[in-house]
Amino acid sequence: MNKKKDDCGGLSLPSDSVFCSLHANDSIWQHDKKVLRGGKASRDGLEAERIAAQALEADGWQILGRRLRTSAGEIDILAEMDGLLAIVEVKYRPTLSEAAHALGPRQRKRLIAAASYVLAQHPEYGTEGVRFDVIVVDMAGQVRRITDAFRLDEEGWP
């Protein structure tokens, strides 16, 4: 498998994966122009991800990546604090309760597969553990974080 060195934080990823945007020195690089296209739902989702990333940073998390696409699936936000890696799924819905119920079993499995892929490429991530969080954002911009939304012992590694 060919690897490419991405100029987003020097991450070396297999050539079939793309970091669509990464924070580095307060800049965001857009690598996938498809992200910039789309309708209102796409724009709302991007805004929800921006709000979620800001909330994580305000709580002391380092954002390692946003909209990480792999052949196994996509991770909305990859964040780390004190060696704990958070794989974060962001959901935007009209109300917080609707957003909280928007992560089904198939999507959890894809998220786990994508996390497995990233961890295989970057074993230095998550030295103190890995957890799966969901951040829900409603139309009013209210944010709710569900930490440890699900566990691997419930789903298992792929």
Curated annotation (Swiss-Prot):
<comment type="similarity">
    <text>Belongs to the UPF0102 family.</text>
</comment>
<dbReference type="Pfam" id="PF02021">
    <property type="entry name" value="UPF0102"/>
</dbReference>
<dbReference type="InterPro" id="IPR011856">
    <property type="entry name" value="tRNA_endonuc-like_dom_sf"/>
</dbReference>
<dbReference type="GO" id="GO:0003676">
    <property type="term" value="F:nucleic acid binding"/>
</dbReference>
<dbReference type="InterPro" id="IPR003509">
    <property type="entry name" value="UPF0102_YraN-like"/>
</dbReference>
<protein>
    <recommendedName>
        <fullName>UPF0102 protein GbCGDNIH1_0975</fullName>
    </recommendedName>
</protein>
<dbReference type="InterPro" id="IPR011335">
    <property type="entry name" value="Restrct_endonuc-II-like"/>
</dbReference>
